[in-house]
Amino acid sequence: MSTPILSAWFEELSEGDSFRTRGRTIAEADLVSFSALTGDWHPQHADAEWAGEGPFGERIAHGMLLLSYSLGLAPIDPERILALRGLDSVRFKRPVRIGETISVRGAVTSLRPVDPAAGLVALDWKVLGAEGRVAVRAELQALWRRQPSQAAEGEGEAAVDELSPIQDGRVLA
């Protein structure tokens, strides 16, 4: 594919298309800020003494912090990717420590037109930590915009359920 995957139209995507993001180093301030925003002050993330005696020997990043940062690392084109539709099979595979750099590797696993204006794209989503080892893995579904010419022609099957952001042929904000 010549167009970067996260800037492509739905029709330009194929199963197996993949991407990898730049890195981001996790700092102590990230753990403190995330704890303050979410109220998750578990000592594994917030108490160095407690965490030092625990199974990881030191504080580690919140799993949800890693998942949240992974979405921010992905260079998403808002004119193409309309909405996050879902996350399934989320697994926190290994800890990420303060000072460790994460990146994301994603690959298209399925494509389904859901409306003349959009399609549903499933991605194998991996947050990578030290040495490229998988720290978090999930199945991510995103609502992807179809090319305007395709939408105008009305191609695609209406496969919409009650949770879909598409109703009456329109993508809802």
Question: Language-model segments: which ranges?
Answer:
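Mid-chain, well-packed structural core segment of small domains
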Residues: 79-98, 104
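HotDog/MaoC-like acyl-thioester-processing domains
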Residues: 1-14, 96-101, 105-173
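Well-ordered beta-strand positions in beta-sheet-rich domains
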Residues: 18-23, 89, 137-141
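Hot-dog-fold acyl-thioester-processing enzymes
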Residues: 2-85, 147-173
